Curated annotation (Swiss-Prot):
Residue span of motif DDXXD motif: 328-332
Family listed: Belongs to the terpene synthase family.
Residues bound to Mg(2+) 1: D328, D332
Binding positions (Mg(2+) 3): N472, T476, E480
GO cellular component: chloroplast
Cofactor binding, per record: Binds 3 Mg(2+) ions per subunit.
Gene3D superfamilies the UniProt entry points to: Farnesyl Diphosphate Synthase, Terpene synthase, N-terminal domain
The protein's name in its UniProt record: Class I diterpene synthase 2, chloroplastic
Localisation per UniProt entry: Plastid, Chloroplast
Length: 589
């Protein structure tokens, strides 16, 4: 048996390669080459049977029927399970038109309170989550019957249902959604108790619960997909009686997903080599200070912008992560105040100088790295956007370096700041804004000046950046206090008594509340339909926010990488696929 893929090969550079067809045996994967990831040609009409269509598509069968029958309600549970599976395995992009059709019909049935959705707790929770994430107006009040654990009759075997309720509760986007708040409280407690008591006998399910509870909003696509491939288990959906339908496609879908992941890995490894060459060309390897974040920057960038077709966007994001970190470290520790000012002056002038005019090798290397990278990206963006965006890119650098300067001045002069004064510039200095607004120039979408200067764009930047900034502050305030620098935690701790000085525990609690408020507002904006910003762009803001949770929820992974080193190894090791595993549809050990 073999899997037949329709391949559209996307190169690493801007040069295009013609399409071709290949057949890969299901258990004999090709050696990774410089070609991009597999892309299956999507030319199927939305069908009543998503499970069947997935089977047909990954086996190269095409239904060109013009008939688009209505989806029978009985198909909805299995179709929702298939959507969730495709998303968790990272191959949903190949079936987007089919997924959109199923969700449109699901929303119609949701409005009618169709019993096949509402009669089953797992199906209702999953439908709510998938619809809300896609921007459909669904009320959390429909989950009110499950808000109180006392009203839910749970058996030991109901862990899967509780997981779905827990995941649904994480999609709270309004402050007043008390149903989701209550739901989150008891489901998280219940799942933790199940872990502690050892009542989850299924080892894969046990690991899945651990993973969700550890840092749900910090689950990056790349890491989450790799975990899901390891923990893939068809029996996860047995409560919806969908397992029998899934079992026939289980091994094909898993083989297809692993093949796709391996192809993405091959492209990521090639791009990492390109990034390394850029790093050396910029002479950043000659800087004798700061954090070595090249691989970490690329890893985070590939987890935020994972689509193999978006190589330029991913590399732009990674380059900016590296550049902003190098300059941030220079402002913080390595450079003098005058040298730091000099970098800002040079960016404002935007002219190359003779080497002796820079004042130091470090200033020369940093400015020329920014200068050459921005000029190169501006040329590429001109092709993508059909207009010159260089002035925007330079403006973003001036804004960032100005925020660095403000922070440097406040630390050096020991200026007393209020929390609002600190946050007014620190949301820019966390670098999310410049990284995102530069990289989205390469998503294949035309972005007008009106869009980029809109209040929506500013708010997306601010809410997402504040989440990352405050998460960072909570993990680094001890170190920064020793270095006599300030952040939101130390500012609140040092507040005068008449302003309501509070304990460290109370400060952390207050900042977590601000983080949650901004995260919910960001999710609300990203999910909202009909706005000036395309959803594809808004998703980058949300995924960057997840990157902040990933890096700063349990330490400072960017400065002292621990978990990220394990995940990098896990994500860059090629997946293997064993015949026995395929035949069994996965095991539970």
């Amino acid at each position: 048996m073999s899997l037949r893929f329709n391949l559209i090969v996307t190169p690493f550079s801007n040069h295009r390669i013609r399409n071709r067809r290949e057949t890969f045996p299901a258990q004999e994967f090709p050696v990774a080459t410089s070609k991009s990831a597999v892309k299956v040609k999507c030319n199927l009409i939305t069908s009543t049977d998503l499970v069947g269509k997935v089977r047909e598509k990954i086996n190269g069968k095409v239904d060109n029927s013009l008939e688009v029958p209505a989806i029978h309600p009985v198909d909805i549970p299995s179709n929702l399970c298939m959507i969730d599976t495709l998303e968790r395995l990272g191959v949903d992009r190949y079936f987007q038109s089919e997924i959109d059709g199923v969700l449109e019909e699901t929303y119609r049935l949701w409005q009618q309170k169709e019993k096949d959705i509402f009669a089953d707790v797992t199906c209702r929770a999953m439908a709510f989550r998938l619809l809300r994430v896609k921007g459909y107006e669904v009320s959390s009040d429909e989950l009110a019957p499950y808000a109180d654990q006392a009203h839910v009759n749970l058996q030991i075997s109901d862990v899967t249902a509780v997981i779905e309720l827990y995941r649904a509760s994480q999609e709270r986007i309004y402050e007043e959604e008390s149903t989701l708040e209550k739901l989150h409280a008891w489901t998280s407690t219940y799942l933790k108790q199940q872990l502690v008591s050892g009542t989850i006998s299924d080892k894969k399910l046990h690991k899945q619960v651990e993973y969700y509870l550890k840092n749900y909003h910090g689950i990056l696509d790349l890491v989450g997909i790799r975990r899901s491939l390891d923990l893939y288990d068809i029996d996860h959906y047995q409560i919806l009686k969908a397992a029998d339908r899934f079992r026939t496609i289980c091994k094909d879908l898993l083989a297809f997903s692993r093949q796709d992941f391996n192809n993405c890995q091959a492209q990521y490894q090639r791009e990492l080599q390109l990034l390394q060459r850029w790093y050396e060309d910029c002479r950043l390897d000659k800087l004798n200070y700061g954090r070595d974040v090249l691989r970490i920057s690329y890893f985070v960038s590939s987890a935020i912008i994972g689509d193999p077709e978006l190589s330029d966007a991913r590399l732009a994001f990674a380059k900016y992560c590296v550049l902003t970190t190098c300059i941030d470290d220079f402002f913080d520790h390595a450079g003098s105040r005058e040298e730091s000012y000099r970098i800002l002056e040079l960016v404002k002038e935007w002219k190359e100088k003779p080497a002796e005019d820079y004042g130091s090798k470090e200033v020369e290397f940093l400015f020329t790295a920014v200068y050459n990278t921005v000029n190169e990206l501006a040329e590429m963006a001109y092709v993508e956007q059909g207009r010159c965006v260089k002035s925007l890119l330079i403006k973003l650098w001036v804004e960032l370096l100005t925020s660095f300067k403000k922070e440097l001045d406040s630390w050096t002069d020991d200026t007393a700041l209020s929390l609002d004064e600190y946050l007014s510039s620190s949301w820019v200095s966390i670098t999310s804004r410049i990284n995102i607004l530069t990289s989205i120039q390469f998503l294949g979408l035309k972005l007008s000046e009106e869009m980029l200067s809109s209040q929506e764009c500013t708010d997306l930047c601010r809410h997402g950046s504040l989440v990352v900034r405050l998460l960072n502050d909570m993990q680094t305030f001890e170190k920064e206090r020793r270095e006599n620098t300030k952040n939101s935690v130390s500012i609140l701790l040092e507040a005068p008594k008449h302003e309501g000085a509070i304990t460290e525990e109370e400060v952390i609690s207050k900042i977590k509340e601000i983080v949650e408020q901004n995260r919910r507002k960001l999710m609300q904006m990203v999910y909202q339909r009909g706005t000036i910003f395309p959803r594809k762009c808004k998703d980058v803001f949300l995924k960057s926010c997840r990157g902040g949770y990933y890096l700063y929820s349990n330490g400072d992974e960017f400065t002292s990488p621990v978990q990220i080193m394990e995940d990098m190894k896990l994500c860059y090791e090629p997946l293997t696929f064993h015949p026995l595993e395929a035949n069994n549809g996965g095991n539970k050990n």
